[in-house]
């Protein structure tokens, strides 16, 4: 039920993926591991920033305390969705490149492990998108949600370069 914990679990999964790529002992796997580490640093940092922004406004990280944030903070919803999609490996983002290279590298040496990794990626995407849906969608009925402040110019200025770096 804690947004920060969910993102932290995602980080652990991504580092496991980096390890698998490194131990594939292929050029693709090693390159994918390095790319995934850099990408993960940007994306996870941005996701923790997203949690910090809503925590600063509501003083809770509990998923159940949110819902309907999209109606009140549309710019935030865009950036949070982009970071979530980059985290799950949306094509066109740095998350995709690293994950694809690791999968190609591990497929060359251990195809069965690559199948398990691909399954793990799908399950990871499911729980990250579940988190996004629970926090962002629904009807903004709670007074705390309805009164949330939109992103400030300073916060948008922070998000824009991070978003640009996550694109390939």
Task: List each model region and its residues.
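Interfacial and helix-entry/exit segments of alpha-helical transmembrane bundles
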Residues: 8-14, 18, 43-124, 145-166
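Hydrophobic face of alpha-helices
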Residues: 31, 35, 47, 129, ...
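Transmembrane helix-loop junctions and nearby membrane-interface residues
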Residues: 22-25, 88, 132-135
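Short helix-capping/hinge motifs at transmembrane helix termini and TM-loop junctions
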Residues: 1, 24-25, 59
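Transmembrane alpha-helical segments of integral membrane proteins
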Residues: 128-143
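Helix-coil boundary and interhelical linker segments in multi-pass alpha-helical membrane proteins
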Residues: 18-34, 38, 105-113
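Hydrophobic alpha-helical membrane segments of integral membrane proteins
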Residues: 1-12, 31-38
């Amino acid at each position: 039920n804690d947004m920060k914990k969910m993102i932290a679990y995602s980080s652990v999964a991504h580092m496991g993926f980096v390890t698998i790529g490194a131990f594939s002992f292929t050029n693709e796997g090693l390159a994918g591991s390095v790319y995934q580490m850099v990408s993960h640093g940007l994306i996870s940092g941005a996701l923790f920033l997203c949690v910090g922004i809503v925590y600063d406004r509501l003083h809770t990280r509990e998923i159940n305390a949110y819902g309907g944030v999209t109606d009140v903070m549309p710019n935030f919803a865009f950036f949070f969705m982009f970071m979530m999609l980059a985290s799950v490996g949306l094509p066109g983002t740095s998350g995709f490149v690293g994950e694809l290279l690791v999968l190609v590298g591990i497929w060359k040496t251990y195809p069965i492990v690559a199948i398990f990794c691909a399954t793990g990626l799908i399950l990871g995407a499911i729980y990250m998108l579940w988190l996004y849906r629970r926090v962002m969608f629904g009807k903004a009925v709670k007074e705390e949600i309805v009164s949330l402040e939109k992103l400030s110019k300073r916060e948008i200025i922070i998000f824009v370069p991070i978003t640009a770096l996550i694109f390939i």
